[in-house]
C-alpha cells in the first residue's frame, strides 16, 4: 500500500531543493501526495478498510498543515508546487 522506495527516491530527486534534501516542505508534500494517491487506489477496491481510511485522513491532515506552512512562508514556491502536483483546480 505504501509507495515503493524507488518511487519515493524519484519523487525526492524531482522536488529536492538541493542534493540530499529529503526534509523540505516540497519533498514532504510530494511524498505525502503519492502516498495519498496510493491509499485512494487501495480504498477503491477495499471499501471497508477503515484502518487505511484513518491513515489516509492523517496523511491528508499532515499535507494540509505543510501546505499552509509553505503558503505562509513562500507563496511562489507554494503555487509552483500545487501546479506541478495538480492539487488545486
UniProtKB/Swiss-Prot annotation:
PROSITE patterns cross-referenced by the UniProt entry: RIBOSOMAL_S15
Q: Name one Pfam family in it.
A: Ribosomal_S15
One GO molecular-function annotation for this sequence? rRNA binding
Keyword Ribosomal protein present in the record's keywords: the answer is yes
- What Gene Ontology terms describe where this protein resides (cellular component)? cytosolic small ribosomal subunit
Q: Which GO terms describe its biological process?
A: translation
Keywords assigned: Ribonucleoprotein, Ribosomal protein, RNA-binding, rRNA-binding
Q: What does this protein do?
A: One of the primary rRNA binding proteins, it binds directly to 16S rRNA where it helps nucleate assembly of the platform of the 30S subunit by binding and bridging several RNA helices of the 16S rRNA. Forms an intersubunit bridge (bridge B4) with the 23S rRNA of the 50S subunit in the ribosome.
Q: Which family does it belong to?
A: Belongs to the universal ribosomal protein uS15 family.
- Known partners and oligomeric status: Part of the 30S ribosomal subunit. Forms a bridge to the 50S subunit in the 70S ribosome, contacting the 23S rRNA.
Stated name of the protein: Small ribosomal subunit protein uS15
Species of origin reads Pediococcus pentosaceus (strain ATCC 25745 / CCUG 21536 / LMG 10740 / 183-1w)
| Chain's gene name | rpsO
Amino acid at each position: 500500500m505504501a509507495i515503493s522506495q524507488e518511487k519515493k527516491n524519484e519523487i525526492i530527486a524531482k522536488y529536492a531543493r538541493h542534493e540530499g534534501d529529503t526534509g523540505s516542505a516540497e519533498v514532504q508534500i510530494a511524498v505525502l501526495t503519492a502516498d495519498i494517491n496510493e491509499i485512494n487506489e487501495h480504498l477503491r477496491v477495499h471499501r471497508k478498510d477503515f484502518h487505511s481510511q484513518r491513515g489516509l485522513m492523517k496523511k491528508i491532515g499532515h499535507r494540509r498543515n505543510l501546505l499552509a506552512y509553505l503558503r505562509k512562508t513562500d507563496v511562489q514556491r507554494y503555487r509552483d508546487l500545487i501546479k506541478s502536483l495538480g492539487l488545486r483546480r
